[in-house]
């Protein structure tokens, strides 16, 4: 395959935990070409991103200015893709910038509000530019969510516990919110009160997510990403759990997102809609 037929990819947050895995995955993919690596770490500026992530040099320097790197992705025959694993505080502007340049975002950064997602969807539709926002790229997580949707038909009580490393900035996780949304869309009323409740410590029972489903967030060093969906009824407890033991598990989903987003003309929320 000639270089002009490869999908150009920019990775934003290239030196972060997820960004490093994306760089490695894109470098190994025969149909993708890394054309830009963005990271704000001042000690890495100008360094070859391949060497930064511990693989062979890729002749792609680490740069801090997203705008200038997006220009590189617009100079190729095929529309480029920006993969964003950065920070909730900046992801909205990152996605708008990419769409404005005609570069298609694949977003794993969580923390966007419903209104921000709606605004980005309107912007992408007007630009006829594909955009994928996925709370989680692990296929196992999608299977967990599907199993939870099936189970909720038979249980009236459900709560979600999500556990992440203590460097995660947002809580609850996008995956937990998405799971609660999927359950709420089933139209059931969950967790009818059994007694008059009183919290002696505010928030002890977790925050209420979509469908008034309690979500509990835990942040500890030593964790990566984990989630439990707990269903209860008299005499039984049904627990569905997913554990991430290595961030490599997200890469098949990220690569799928890159390949699919170039076919889209607007925003899609959730990787499961592309399967």
UniProtKB/Swiss-Prot annotation:
GO molecular-function terms, A-Z: 4-hydroxy-tetrahydrodipicolinate reductase; NAD binding; NADP binding; oxidoreductase activity, acting on CH or CH2 groups, NAD or NADP as acceptor
Catalytic activity line of the entry: (S)-2,3,4,5-tetrahydrodipicolinate + NAD(+) + H2O = (2S,4S)-4-hydroxy-2,3,4,5-tetrahydrodipicolinate + NADH + H(+); (S)-2,3,4,5-tetrahydrodipicolinate + NADP(+) + H2O = (2S,4S)-4-hydroxy-2,3,4,5-tetrahydrodipicolinate + NADPH + H(+)
Subcellular location field: Cytoplasm
Enzyme nomenclature, EC number: 1.17.1.8
Residues annotated as transmembrane: none
Tagged with keyword DNA-binding: no
Annotated InterPro entries: DapB_C, DapB_N, DapB_N_CS, DHDPR_bac, NAD(P)-bd_dom_sf
Annotated binding of (S)-2,3,4,5-tetrahydrodipicolinate, by residue: 165, 174-175
Any single Pfam family the record assigns to this protein: DapB_C
This protein's GO CC annotations: cytosol
UniProt keyword terms in alphabetical order: Amino-acid biosynthesis, Cytoplasm, Diaminopimelate biosynthesis, Lysine biosynthesis, NAD, NADP, Oxidoreductase
Active site (UniProt): 164 (proton donor/acceptor), 168 (proton donor)
Entry protein name: 4-hydroxy-tetrahydrodipicolinate reductase
Taxonomic source organism: Synechocystis sp. (strain ATCC 27184 / PCC 6803 / Kazusa)
